[in-house]
Amino acid sequence: MTSNIFKKVLARRLAVQALYQWQLNEQPIDKIIEEFKSSELYTNIDAEYFAYLLTNIDAKFEELKKTIENASDLSWNRIQPVEKGVILIGVLELQSGILDHHITINECVELSKHFGSEDGY
């Protein structure tokens, strides 16, 4: 049995993949969510949290992007899509206050290690 905490970890991982697809294919987020529901990995995640992350990042994208641009020395266009996904998840979680900031930061570091490039941000 998968713990609720691990289900959220897996939801974030799948969300990074979905955000990567969203950035490259520019599909509506609800279509991407539907596509990911057929993934074998989807059965092990916190599906509600996965949908929460994606729909809120989509709805608040310009606000989140502006926050990231204001806090970074890099322009948005220089950040790789995988790293953008991780950062978007982190900023959304930090702004929403749904998790302790220590948890969010740790989870984003782990996502970066898992998905990011060796020289990731």
Model-derived segments and spans:
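N-terminal interaction/assembly modules
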Residues: M1-Y121
